[in-house]
Amino acid sequence: MANEQTRLKILQVSIELFYEKGYDAVGVQEIADKCELTKPALYYHFKNKSGILEGIMQQYIDPVVVKLREVVNNSSSFEDSLHNFAYCYVSEGCENLHLYLMLMTMQYSPPMSEFNNAFIHHCTEINNIVKSIFINARGLLGNMNGRENQFATTFLGMIGFHMYEYHSEKEPKMNKSAVDMIIHQFLHGIYS
């Protein structure tokens, strides 16, 4: 149990440091110091810094991707899928806001960077989940055929921007009514 607690502490401290300084600006020694561990103790749990990053993805992002896929698959309609995806995405983002904001800023890291290599698969998975919503709704929206990826990117961008805006006010206020307003605005745009 102590090993698992230490491992989780390393992941949480790393999230905070990566959020505050960026992935490239943080070294393993700084993570070890903040965790009150020696470097060998940290290396017992993770081979290197990219191993920590992969641990973050496995511990926190993989389960979110599974939840997002489930809520979309269990939705009864196009609009229900959008709402359920957005509620899940926002609630997970607010629950672990620094992780979400770290990922949001770092997704624009250079294509060959360590971070990009670790995160691109997850980013693609999330985009594909949203894209599937639009692919399944082709019959509803005649203007959508061939533009599913554009719609998915715009939808994710709207949610992400609003999450960032609410955070910049130092208090995440993304609740059901805020998400409903975003969905309403998005639907108004695509139905016109």
Q: Can you describe what each PLM-predicted range is?
A:
Residues 88-91, 128-136, 157-192:
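C-terminal peripheral helix-coil segments that are non-catalytic and often amphipathic
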Residues 5, 9, 13, 17-51, ...:
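Helix-turn-helix
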Residues 90-132, 139-143, 163:
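Short secondary-structure transition hinges
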